[in-house]
Amino acid sequence: MSFLETLHRVVDWCVGFSGRVFVLFAVIAIVLVLIEMLVYAAAKKPKTGHKKRVALITGASSGLGREYAKRLDRTERGLDEIWLVARRADRLNALAGELGCGTHVLPLDLTKPESLTALKTALRESDVEVAVLINCAGLGKIGNYAKLSLADSDNMIEVNDRAAVDVTVTALPFMGPGGRILEICSTAAFQPLQHFGVYAASKVFLYHYTRALRMELLPRHIRVTAVCPYWMRDTEFIPIAKAAEAKGEKPAIKNFAFGVPADRVARRSLRTNRLGMAVSTPGLFCTIHRFFSKLLPREVLLYFWELLRRL
């Protein structure tokens, strides 16, 4: 037998073995997901008596939060009210007027401790059950370490991380079996992003917090999903993110390609959460991004981002 024939057989065996291992792990993963879905389906419905079932949405005044409110209003059965939380009362009131479901408007700045106290008081005094919690409040600013002010960096950490954790912990005592939580992370959580470093790091924190929280809440039959979209082209996020860049200077990110509409993100992530899945990547590009972030070295991902942001 020649060397080439031997090499060919070795390669064939390796490919065949790798394929069998991959199929085995895929089958195991599918079985585990199905078991988890059955556990959720078998969870006893909470006996809430006279309590109203509400959906609590932060960052509801615009963008993705607004789309979640509209979609829940159209599709979520059994909700008595949708609680809308954001800073801009006028926008919240305008959105409340568009919804058919009952609403409760809470104009709060979640970076302030007194706002968390007000939220907790409202939940307790209203005697409600939080059926759905969606943490959409978020902030991103583009720029390297020299371009971003300390205030910009601190605000991103406050809104994206501390406020999300505080709202979640505040709402959890009011949730029962069958409750659902969606934490809005980002594909930025999958790798470091130069010129977007603080934002990406803040989303890494929220992503890992959400994954850990999901395991902690399994015994309570509360479904927790980390929602990781790519750019959303029809929200205020991109204009606000670019606000830190001075006029006339070369932009750190030239194009925001492969963006998806916010309503698609809301629709797909809600469906993923209902199925009890841990992560939602609502779009082809963000799904590919997540897959390759697990395979490729960080250095390769960093150089790929460097290329992508210059296109």
Task: Give, region by region, the residue ranges found by the protein language model.
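Conserved glycine-rich cofactor-binding loop
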Residues: 61-62
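Residue(s) in the substrate-gating loop at a strand-loop-helix junction
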Residues: 186
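C-terminal helical subdomain
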Residues: 226, 247-290
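Substrate-binding pocket helix/loop in short-chain dehydrogenase/reductase
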Residues: 144-145, 149-154
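Conserved glycine-rich Rossmann-like NAD(P)H-binding loop of the short-chain dehydrogenase/reductase
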Residues: 76-94
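Active-site helix of classical SDR
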Residues: 168, 202
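Conserved NAD(P)H cofactor-binding loop of Rossmann-fold oxidoreductase domains
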Residues: 136-141
